[in-house]
């Protein structure tokens, strides 16, 4: 088998990386034409590595060396003499990513696209070409199911379980007064839904909102802007447990503390 490794540079990753290389000693490390991609790190590294790294039909394996591991199926303790046989017996599936399109660019999002504005700049939201609302506030989040345990959760969005492929929109600190009232609650939309944000050119460039795709700032000019969103199937295949119990266990170990 041919493989490629992406590893974070944290101290705790290095021994796991060495262990993985030893386990894969009968496989061939290559730069192109690989069948497996191994990503070593936490969820943040996984997202930054693979959100726009979408190789055709390669199998992506996450190995957690960080604190949170919603995108990873293994940790260093799993890298034993049985690892390869377990790995080749697992089912890998394509997942839904959020495709983001602007006038000149198209890219994929695993967690969320975040819009921030410090001037409560108006953003018109359209759902399947129907005007939903004119939002004013601190910003907006939009993302697929996979992002519901990331920034969306911190913003009081819904935690969405596996096998529920939807798009979620969350308002951040909406501006409210008698003539400006928005939905305020998170919106959950079916996977086929097309969403569009329309923003007019600002009088001053510094008033124009800032846009971040999985934490990376986008270079969007101060001009009339339309950004569209829709779920698309990844080209890569991923292994992550879709069992309810496994997801509940991760949620409880990460977020829920009770005596």
Curated annotation (Swiss-Prot):
NAD(+) binds at residues 43-44, 111-112, 136. It is an enzyme of class 2 (transferase). GO terms for molecular function: ATP binding; metal ion binding; NAD binding; NAD+ kinase activity. One of its GO terms (cellular component) is cytoplasm. Its EC number is 2.7.1.23. Transmembrane segments: none annotated. It catalyses: NAD(+) + ATP = ADP + NADP(+) + H(+). InterPro entries: ATP-NAD_kinase_N, ATP-NAD_kinase_PpnK-typ_C, NAD/diacylglycerol_kinase_sf, NADK. It is found in: Cytoplasm. Its main location: cytoplasm. The active site is at residue 43. It comes from the Bacteria. Its cofactor is a divalent metal cation. One of its GO terms (biological process) is NAD metabolic process. SUPFAM superfamilies: NAD kinase/diacylglycerol kinase-like. Keywords: ATP-binding, Cytoplasm, Kinase, NAD, NADP, Nucleotide-binding, Transferase. Involved in the regulation of the intracellular balance of NAD and NADP, and is a key enzyme in the biosynthesis of NADP. Catalyzes specifically the phosphorylation on 2'-hydroxyl of the adenosine moiety of NAD to yield NADP. Belongs to the NAD kinase family. PANTHER family: NAD KINASE (PTHR20275:SF0). This is NAD kinase. It comes from Mycoplasma genitalium (strain ATCC 33530 / DSM 19775 / NCTC 10195 / G37). The gene is nadK.
